[in-house]
């Protein structure tokens, strides 16, 4: 995440998917943060088979979530909405099946019952889609 006024030149030797959202940092989030997801420890999630890696130390929730095969989560609502990008595998809920590369945007107070039969890793951002 790059604060206003900063710059960068992204590159990749082998190609990649670059997920970019501009202009979303609050006044209290102006410091650049870097998380090395190859070395950061995964933490136990709220149900067996779920592990999480928080990506922001403050503010809204940005998290990597790893689902082991045949992991099921409780039905729940999202205060402030939720965005999901499926990094690998297949993520599912009662609304559909979302393979790697899928993006899901669910509005404030949306509800679902997520699971993954095959296993997956997703990027999740929550709480930033409040109604104006």
List each model region and its residues:
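Short histidine-centered beta-strand/loop micro-motifs
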Residues: 10-11, 64-65, 74-78, 95-96, ...
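Glycine- and acidic-residue-biased ligand/ion/polar-headgroup-sensing regions
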Residues: 68-71, 78-94, 100
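Tight coil/turn sites that cap or link beta-strands
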Residues: 5, 68-70, 101, 107-109
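A structural connector/turn signal
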Residues: 62, 81, 93, 109-111
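A short, N-terminal "cap"/entry segment at the start of jelly-roll beta-barrel domains
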Residues: 13-59, 132
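Regulatory nucleotide-sensing modules
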Residues: 55, 72-75
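Ligand-binding loop in jelly-roll beta-barrel domains
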Residues: 3-28, 108-132
């Amino acid at each position: 995440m790059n604060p206003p006024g900063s710059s960068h030149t992204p590159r990749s030797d082998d190609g990649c998917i670059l997920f970019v959202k501009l202009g979303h940092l609050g006044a209290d989030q102006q410091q650049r943060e870097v998380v090395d997801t190859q070395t950061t420890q995964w933490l136990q999630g709220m149900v067996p088979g779920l592990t999480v890696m928080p990506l922001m130390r403050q503010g809204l929730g940005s998290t990597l979530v790893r689902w082991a095969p045949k992991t099921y989560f409780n039905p729940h609502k999202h205060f402030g909405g939720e965005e999901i990008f499926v990094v690998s595998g297949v993520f599912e809920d009662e609304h559909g099946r979302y393979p790697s590369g899928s993006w899901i945007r669910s509005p404030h107070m949306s509800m679902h019952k997520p699971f993954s039969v095959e296993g997956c890793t997703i990027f999740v951002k929550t709480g930033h889609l409040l109604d104006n």
